[in-house]
């Protein structure tokens, strides 16, 4: 190493001496054409030509060559001696989104020719799309309003056809769609209504562009009450570990700007990095609590000592979090705000403000650094130290009042081709300790590369320190050093410059410099107007061609403010108004702009903050913001035609050194590459390269490089009053409380102004408004937010929940607020209504309220009607001689009475039940039902060629296109809750449509074990296979399914055992043994998923090996582990059933029948079937269904046919359907008016028969498909509203069967089908189903419940119809298969804590027809206002309880099984919100696999009648 350092300068000097010295080519014609390496179609692009010293007229031409065609871009005839200009050209749209093409530039004259060919990337211009909703969150039954905005890459509006727009709910259902939408002037507004009972959660609007890309915008649907005030937590953003105190303030501010009175509770915590759930809160975090009253400004401040938070300890997170709750005075409404402060070990920090990434030998290297403390505050008058070893530089300097310091480093004697600079303030602390943090003083590091020049002539651009603001002209200094020996007799030197932005050349220019004798050094300035055309990143290139053909230059990168050319303004006049008054909204923008306006209640934004639509978000849509290099597909090194340097190797001390080209040095070519520009030139832009030597002359060992190897650094040049004219009314009635007030389109006049007169809503709040404007000339513009505060000094407001239960009393609170300077006496009245019963808390006629005071009046209200019930409350200032304190109350001249009318949703009492009716109606399929025959059905096969064979056939009602009908009778049980019934009717064009949209939510029951996770995993494979086979798979559906597969794969590994097997709850639940059945399920699913996601082969190999070890000598498999579903044990031959299941799994992987494990397993099954045929007892239906499918997979058609024949002897044939039942199934409760869905095991076994039919080899015959169709009709009737079934295994097997059947019968050529549903009365609705909307969920509410309806389908294909009937019932004692008792401790309202806390004790046992249940779920609903204490729920997890969950006001307890022995479960609940006259809550226990085996009970809080007084 030492030799290398000593010899290094000598070798560098040697290379310099080897440069040619007779390179003068003065007067030789020079050509330089610069074109971006990325070109967009259908938009103007530029290429810049520089031709100098021409001695004849030449033609410059550019052509683009693709695999399809050659296209001329431009042709210029140049007669001038010197020329510099940029040519614009436009490429047509390409059939592919992007492709690499060859660009050829030719300069040709009578005596000379220059031609060069290189690659460029050509991309089709992408339209930029974004969506704006009128607000971020919606309630049920509200209308969602949204806008689609389409722009080109210059932000100008587009007229474009959008193929598809749709809205997707949280379950993945497509609930609204628009096809082939013509968007004009870049904007389209759409709306759709939410149903009364939509899924709650995150929705999204999806826009599919013509190019195939999509844009998405989320919104939320919830039941909510808007917050009236904001809780602001104010604390430092950052503190250092040396801080001893931190100031925290909590403030409450109403949306109309007034302070909130009340009390604050503040919890300040520093969490552990690795918290524990075992020891309560203190094992999660170190916390300190504070509380106090808010002051007159609505704030509470606390100086907190940081000692408790142990800022110097490592085991904590590096932040302190604050959660503050403000309880409003009078209403007890409590809202929460959060804040956090970061903890840093950085005490001081140095950073480079302006510094070049390159250096030029002989020119001082300068820069500027900034010193700040840990909080980012500049530190003045501090000494800092600068070190640059390669330049042998050590110095110090002092920061100025802004914390800045400049430095300069001499580069004349620099070693090597790069410079590393270190700037430090203080040395780091020498003290280190385990789990302790040390203070840090961050140094600044920078590396700069040497710029190569043959003549040591340079031009360089001065760095700028900051983002450049729009609307101003920026001066850029260009410095130059020019050697006289190369300038010779030149009179003037022209510098050329280009500015690139968004990947294209946008500006160009020149600067002429008079040439003086000798060496020249100086600078000149260039003025750059900063506008939107060069945002968000501008790259500036400057260069000049010297007389000898050398090109000198530099490039710089500047961050530009995100600005838009269309300057939009928005303001309200006046800025503060009374409710229901008139106001003006003034919009200013470019003339003739189309402006979209929006004004939203600030409370909505407090409820759900949204990402602000800003210039930055629009710029983020750009596919190319900055072309920092060549695209990777064209990033090969350009051919260098310049001469290489040849010389001998150097021998020193017996070692041979050979020179290499230095990779760190920058040359003109690298500056052009930084710009993303392809250069076509005969000038010298490359540094000299070493001529390659024969390989045999090289020394392979102990070779030292003539230049050090360093990583090349990227270039970084980072641098309230009322309007007197508005008179308030004497009395106000306020009933209009929109959440979105303004949602309009207006066109700005030719003067650039538009005024809208608006009526202010009745909400006392602040409205936040914005405008989005589009102009053909200037493009997009966005206004700053405009605010209008709506206020009156005397008003009343109501505090109500989102909804209440009929008959359940709640407290209605009306708060009267007086912001007048004087006291007033107020009368408050609640208008009586037959819809509710109201009892005032206090019988008081009037209340005294002084300035800035309030009074809350309460009523105990019991609703009597369902739906939206209006509450009307009036507050009136009355005349009185009774003093308010020492003051005589006044009656305001204006606004003496305020009336507010607000609705409240009243929901039915009791237990909600849902009944699903499914139908698969097929007016035209290959197989059509003709009617019943001998208790079964007859089907006819219509081959397509026989569509018009005979006249008789044409009139056959079963022919394709015939009408197929089915009746629908909606009935209600006698114990139905009055007015609670509602029904909806849905149409889908695909048999798997609902399931493929809901693969994560197929079951309406909890998930929490390894089997349930696989039930979510496996259907994704079947859906992907089905969509692939039917050519319906879209990129969006594929990505969603693959996401689910990846997450399911990772989750399933949690349940893996060390030996490769899997169990229901994994090893951590104390299960020492894997489960044979579940391991087989996982094995086949992982194997099938390999085609879509990465699956580690080790998991498959280990599971297969483990299963092989369980195979007995007769080929059958031993059962190990606990089966949660004991229905699989219900057959006569447990071993055969399990072996059949495992054999199926192995064949589905797929393993060949010749595989030893499979071959032996098939021997087991064949032997078992022979024994069953010969024996008198036969075989269980479940077992036979599995055997039929196993033999079908194995290709044993003889055995398959035998087993199917036996199965059909036991089939149940009714209503044109076929299915199978178990001989001894559990007794079902018979009091329901509707037959419950079939048990899980019966769906599963019936689905296996479908698979046996459609897996017939080599292909299913018409008879197989005929029978499969009959079975599918029955299976489809068992689906739930999510597309799943009762439980896990039936869902997995049935969806597998439906996907195979769907693929076997699918046709893409079908025409439309028309669906009609009509009642016996006047209601009738039609739907159209075709290929384009077959995945769209079309839905309508049914008006008559109870009622009689008929459903009919005409046209072609099968249509899946689903009706959902919901109603509430009052539960009653019955003969349940479970014994369930619920008690509360205490049972009565005794003791000081009974109002706020009690225990729920559950006793459960199984008394059904079986020895024990399968896995069971206990679902405990909380009474209103109470929440479970999670640690007490977690403590239930012991031998019989596998898992617990707390979700959506429910506690879910998983039981491995329930026997006749009583199991007792107890946990604690705490009061969250006081509620009066609590209704009982429901507890339900049910068998996970036999969901019709259940029991319900109810419990009441100990203090149900008076708990609201707590």
Curated annotation (Swiss-Prot):
PROSITE patterns, alphabetized: ALPHA_2_MACROGLOBULIN
UniProt entry tagged with the keyword Signal: yes
Cleaved signal peptide residues: 1-23
Isoglutamyl cysteine thioester (Cys-Gln) crosslink residues: 1009-1012
GO cellular component annotations of the record: extracellular space
Cysteines paired by S-S bonds: 48-86, 251-299, 269-287, 470-563, 595-773, 644-691, 823-850, 848-884, 922-1358, 1116-1164, 1389-1503
Keywords: Disulfide bond, Glycoprotein, Protease inhibitor, Secreted, Serine protease inhibitor, Signal, Thioester bond
Residues covered by region (Inhibitory): 706-711, 721-725, 732-737
Glycosylation sites: 55, 70, 870, 1028, 1440, 1460
Subcellular locations according to the entry: Secreted
GO molecular function: endopeptidase inhibitor activity; protease binding; serine-type endopeptidase inhibitor activity
Region described as Bait region: 692-730
Tissue: Plasma.
Pfam families assigned: A2M, A2M_BRD, A2M_recep, MG2, MG3, MG4, TED_complement
Entry's transmembrane regions: none
InterPro entries (UniProt xref): A-macroglobulin_rcpt-bd, A-macroglobulin_rcpt-bd_sf, A2M/Complement_sys, A2M_N_BRD, A2M_TED, Alpha-macroglob_thiol-ester_cl, Alpha-macroglobulin_TED, Ig-like_fold
CDD domains: A2M_2 (cd02897)
PANTHER family attached to this UniProt entry: ALPHA-2-MACROGLOBULIN, MACROGLOBULIN / COMPLEMENT
Family the entry assigns: Belongs to the protease inhibitor I39 (alpha-2-macroglobulin) family.
Function, as annotated: Is able to inhibit all four classes of proteinases by a unique 'trapping' mechanism. This protein has a peptide stretch, called the 'bait region' which contains specific cleavage sites for different proteinases. When a proteinase cleaves the bait region, a conformational change is induced in the protein which traps the proteinase. The entrapped enzyme remains active against low molecular weight substrates (activity against high molecular weight substrates is greatly reduced).
Quaternary organization: Homotetramer; disulfide-linked.
Official protein name in the record: Alpha-2-macroglobulin
Provenance organism: Bos taurus (Bovine)
Recorded name of the encoding gene: A2M
